[in-house]
Amino acid sequence: MLMPKRVKYRKQQRGRIKGNATRGNTLTYGEYGLQALEPGWITATQIEAARVAMTRFIKRGGKVWIKIFPDKPVTKKPAETRMGSGKGSPEFWVAVVKPGRVLFEIAGVSEEVAKEALRLAMHKLPIKTKFLKREELGGEDNEG
């Protein structure tokens, strides 16, 4: 399971997710990717479930990159506890995702295989996503 080795503060406030992703919104490593279309929290368990679904489908071919990391702790109070007496203890970790963020990338497989692998991963995630394909000629990726 993904989580930070150590953090400066054990507990964080929830915060708001405003605007679109300005970083991590293009394909960096792979040929195909999965891009978030709406904001949300993705837990470490969901990331792992999506990764397992993809790697099982593509078997030994290809490589998968996980482009998000769960670095935000989410606290929870025990069941049947009265209100008050402080904030609960950290229960799990989430990655905060803005629309436009690339979540996963795949390379070394055909487009059909990549599409199906990312479709399987899509079903494990709590947000709407879309399939991305690297444009070889033209587009924003060519700089220079």
Curated annotation (Swiss-Prot):
GO molecular-function terms, A-Z: rRNA binding; structural constituent of ribosome; tRNA binding
Keyword annotations for this protein, in alphabetical order, are:
Ribonucleoprotein, Ribosomal protein, RNA-binding, rRNA-binding, tRNA-binding
| Superkingdom in the source lineage | Bacteria
State whether keyword Coiled coil applies: no
Q: Does the keyword Protein biosynthesis apply?
A: no
Quaternary structure per UniProt?
Answer: Part of the 50S ribosomal subunit.
Q: Which family does this protein fall into?
A: Belongs to the universal ribosomal protein uL16 family.
Protein name (Swiss-Prot/TrEMBL) = Large ribosomal subunit protein uL16
Primary gene name: rplP
